[in-house]
Every structure is written in structure tokens, then in C-alpha cells.
Amino acid sequence: MRTVTVGTRGSALALAQTRWVVARLKEEWPDTDFRIQTISTKGDRDRAALQSLAQKGDKGFWVKEIEDALLAGRIDIAVHSLKDLPTEQPEGLEIASIPKRVDARDVLIGKDGMKRLEDLPSGARVGTSSVRRKAFLRAYRPDLQILDLRGNIDTRLAALGTPDYDAIVLAAAGLIRTEMRHRIDEFIDPDLLLPAPGQGALALETRADDDLSIEVVYAIHDHATDDRVTAEREFLAGLGAGCMAPVGAHATLKDGVLTLEGWVGALDGSQVIRATTSGDPAECADLGAELAADMLGQGAQQLIEAAHR
């Protein structure tokens, strides 16, 4: 029996994602022994420094140590949340498989009487860790108090038990993967709040010359998800932005047409830019790049740079 080592961060969400991946791979390769190895990243060790790291252009704080282990041959496959992965991979590595996306949307969880974004009273205190969500909420509901809230899912949910927060906004996928879907009060429609590029999708990364591992992970590759997230990530790359920028993107496929929406907002909520394009899914990368160019022409770069000052 051959052994394949799968690397991941050690958080509850990362482990839940990786166990899901391993279960799918085991269905395809029953004679293979998959072993999970947890790896601590810079983002895990120093969450307080994330904003300053982003300002310095460091885009690999959730993945670098895992990619180093992959390059060194200590692991064979890396499992990442796609939205945390920089748009360019280190030389010698590639995204070899993208499984079917779970749910790209953001969700709201609130105290009694505050279960929907529309129901939040003026002055309600809303916690989130994402600059994208902060920018959106300040633009959409300038009457709310938008507060920083970091930590894992359990930490954020526990914050609702304190007087400091009336509601929190976070990604649906994390709650679904950790079997806490029942805690969700409202799924926020992407027509209102565009998710982060790649949100809800996973990336399985391998060494580019490791044909065996590439074959193993490609067995659970989902082409439709790949087309959608490729458009979203090319949009992000075209803007020259990273995962901590106030940027949203969401691609949909219907009747053979891929539609991509992009959003960039000022962190204080004073300005937003939103645009849409559509075309052949086979041209998903070009669609993302074209939409980025369109929005750069409308001043998107200035909003992104201002958010990192």
C-alpha cells in the first residue's frame, strides 16, 4: 500500500476540510494510505501582525510553511482554502485540483431580534475580520458600528455571548464544513455582498513534477468550480491585490455562459466600484483580467492602496 502525506494548517476548520478531502480521495484510491500532517503558518502564530504583513506585500502568511514542506518533499499534497492562496504559486508547485465548491456566500449570525442584516437597529455592533466585509457594511449600513473580530470560528461565535457584539458576519463555508450550519441566521445574497475571490473552494497543491500526486488529486477535480474561481482569481491578480484587500468577486455559470461580478470598496465605506462581464467559460481567465482592467480604469487601485495604509 502506498502512502501519501497530506499537509494542512492545524485549525479545526483546516482539519475538517482536509479530512473531507482525504475521505473523497480514499473513495477514489482505496488502496492508498493517506496521512494528515499539520503545519503551523505565520498567520497562525501571529494573527495580530496580519494587517502589517499585508501592507508589506506579504501574501503567503497562511500557506508559506506548508508550501515549503511540499517543496522539501515532507508532504505530497497541500490542502488550502483557495481564498487564502496567493494568485501566483512558487516555482515548482501547482494547483493540481479544485474540488467542488461548497458555498461562496457570507452569512450573518445575530442575537435575538437581529437575525437579518436589514433587521439590525441603528448603532448595532457587528464584528468581522475581513476588510472586504467592513468596507461593504460601512457603505451599505453606515449607521452600524463595524468592529474588528478575529480568531477561529468558535472564538467568533463566543463573541456573541458578550455585550461587545450584536451580530457577526463570516463565510458560510467554514460553518458548513465544521457542521455548524444550524448557527447561520441569514445567507447574504451575492447580489448584495460579493464574496472574496475563491471563497468556499479548496485548492489541492502538489509539486509540479509529482505525476503520481497530481493523478491522485485530479480524481476529485471539478471543472465548473475551476472555471468560476479562475475568473475570480484572475480578477484579483489583475488588480494586483491579495486576500486582505477590500475586493469581492463571484462567478456563476448558466446556460453555457460565465458571468463574473467584481467589487472594490473604500474601507470607510465612502466609495464602491462594481462591474460585471460575461462570456465563454473557456475564456474564464481572460474575463477576469478584462474586468480588472475595467475597474482599474474606474479607480480601483486607489481604493485598494488606501485600505492598506
From Swiss-Prot:
Q: Which cofactor does it need?
A: dipyrromethane
Q: What class of enzyme is it?
A: transferase
The alphabetical list of record keywords is: Porphyrin biosynthesis, Transferase
Residues where S-(dipyrrolylmethanemethyl)cysteine is found: C243
Coiled coil spans: none
Specify the pathway. Porphyrin-containing compound metabolism; protoporphyrin-IX biosynthesis; coproporphyrinogen-III from 5-aminolevulinate: step 2/4
Q: How is the cofactor bound?
A: Binds 1 dipyrromethane group covalently.
Pfam families linked to this entry: Porphobil_deam (PF01379), Porphobil_deamC (PF03900)
InterPro entries with a match to the protein in the record: HemC (IPR000860), Porphobilin_deaminase_cofac_BS (IPR022419), Porphobilin_deaminase_N (IPR022417), Porphobilinogen_deaminase_C (IPR022418), Porphobilinogen_deaminase_C_sf (IPR036803)
A Gene Ontology molecular function term for this protein is: hydroxymethylbilane synthase activity
Q: Does the keyword Disulfide bond apply?
A: no
- Can you quote a single GO CC term? cytoplasm
GO annotations under biological process? protoporphyrinogen IX biosynthetic process
Q: Which reaction does it catalyse?
A: 4 porphobilinogen + H2O = hydroxymethylbilane + 4 NH4(+)
Protein task: Tetrapolymerization of the monopyrrole PBG into the hydroxymethylbilane pre-uroporphyrinogen in several discrete steps.
Q: What else is known?
A: The porphobilinogen subunits are added to the dipyrromethane group.
Task: Describe, as the record does, how this protein assembles with itself and its partners.
Answer: Monomer.
Of which family is this protein a member? Belongs to the HMBS family.
Q: What is this protein called?
A: Porphobilinogen deaminase
Q: Which organism is this entry from?
A: Deinococcus geothermalis (strain DSM 11300 / CIP 105573 / AG-3a)
Upper lineage is: Bacteria, Thermotogati, Deinococcota, Deinococci, Deinococcales
